[in-house]
Curated annotation (Swiss-Prot):
Predominantly expressed in petioles (at protein level). Mainly observed in shoots, flowers, siliques and roots, and, to a lower extent, in stems and leaves. One of its GO terms (cellular component) is nucleus. Its main location: cytoplasm. Binds calcium Ca(2+) and may act as a signal mediator to buffer Ca(2+). This is Cytosolic calcium-binding protein 1. It comes from Arabidopsis thaliana (Mouse-ear cress). GO terms for molecular function: calcium ion binding.
Length: 152
């Protein structure tokens, strides 16, 4: 086995540890951070088109009306589709599942029948083998018996 040498380290007293003073944030760093943030847009800086109340109201009202009409029509169409499609799809899925189960069951039945047919000849062969073995000792016994008589 390999041996490991462990070196013990004694902790240094807390008085000897030098802690650097906290870093003072320079004004340059503060300005770069504030410049990287997006500045809020004031009314004096905003484009003229946005500040005009008439144009903004007309533009916002038209899209709202169009979206409201579209929203009203869309749910009705979706609801009708859901009602029509859901009952139609569900029986189809159930039928598919039952068909696959029937097919699987039919295959299992075929496999069982095949196993039965495979097992039957094996059993018959096993029965034949003992008969053949029984015949051989009888023949050997008849052969050995005359030999013994000849020796006497």
């Amino acid at each position: 086995m390999a041996t490991i040498e462990v070196e013990q380290v004694t902790p240094v007293a807390a008085e000897n540890i030098e802690v650097p003073p906290p870093k003072a944030v320079e004004s340059e760093e503060v300005t770069t951070v504030s410049e990287s943030l997006p500045a809020p847009v004031t009314e004096s800086q905003a484009p003229v088109e946005v500040t005009t109340k008439d144009l903004v109201v007309e533009e916002t009202e038209k899209p709202i009306e169009e979206t409201e009409e579209a929203q009203v029509e869309t749910p009705e169409v979706v609801e009708i589709k859901k009602d029509e499609e859901a009952p139609v799809e569900t029986p189809v899925v159930v039928e598919d599942e039952s068909k696959t189960e029937e097919v699987v069951e039919a295959k299992k039945e075929e496999e069982v029948e095949e196993k039965k047919t495979e097992e039957a000849p094996v059993v018959v062969e096993e029965e034949k083998k003992p008969e053949a073995e029984e015949e051989k000792p009888a023949v050997e016994a008849s052969v050995t018996a005359p030999v013994e008589k000849a020796d006497e």
